[in-house]
From Swiss-Prot:
UniProt KW rRNA processing keyword: no
Membrane topology: Single-pass membrane protein
Cellular component aspect of the GO annotation: chloroplast thylakoid membrane; photosystem II reaction center
UniProt organism field: Guillardia theta
Its job: One of the components of the core complex of photosystem II (PSII), required for its stability and/or assembly. PSII is a light-driven water:plastoquinone oxidoreductase that uses light energy to abstract electrons from H(2)O, generating O(2) and a proton gradient subsequently used for ATP formation. It consists of a core antenna complex that captures photons, and an electron transfer chain that converts photonic excitation into a charge separation.
Keywords per UniProt: Chloroplast, Membrane, Photosynthesis, Photosystem II, Plastid, Reaction center, Thylakoid, Transmembrane, Transmembrane helix
Designated name of the protein: Photosystem II reaction center protein I
One Gene Ontology biological process: photosynthesis
Chain segments annotated as transmembrane: 6-25
Signal sequence segment: none
Subunit relationships: PSII is composed of 1 copy each of membrane proteins PsbA, PsbB, PsbC, PsbD, PsbE, PsbF, PsbH, PsbI, PsbJ, PsbK, PsbL, PsbM, PsbT, PsbX, PsbY, PsbZ, Psb30/Ycf12, at least 3 peripheral proteins of the oxygen-evolving complex and a large number of cofactors. It forms dimeric complexes.
Predominant subcellular localization, coarse grouping: plastid
Length: 38
């Protein structure tokens, strides 16, 4: 049960960070200098 909670928290954190990164890099994609995606 504890391992399941760890997996759930890791997945949620991963998707939240992925959504945040995609939302932030959306503005950077209009920028020609994309040094943060390297």
């Amino acid at each position: 049960m504890f391992t399941l909670k760890i997996v759930v928290y890791t997945t949620v954190t991963f998707f939240v960070s992925l959504f945040t990164f995609g939302f932030l890099s959306n503005d950077a994609s209009r920028n020609p200098n994309r040094k943060d995606l390297e």
